[in-house]
Swiss-Prot record:
Pfam families: PsbL. The gene is psbL. The keyword Transmembrane applies. Keywords: Chloroplast, Membrane, Photosynthesis, Photosystem II, Plastid, Reaction center, Thylakoid, Transmembrane, Transmembrane helix. This is Photosystem II reaction center protein L.
Length: 38
């Protein structure tokens, strides 16, 4: 509770990794759907 800065950095890192994972899943879904429809 005395040092909230490392916790804030960890939360931001988890948030960016979550967004990167969602973006990767979205790209894979688009490529997979285009592969199916073509």
């Amino acid at each position: 509770m005395a040092r909230p800065n490392p916790n804030k950095q960890v939360v931001e890192l988890n948030r960016t990794s979550l967004y990167f994972g969602l973006l990767l899943i979205f790209v894979l879904a688009v490529l997979f759907s285009s592969y199916i429809f073509n």
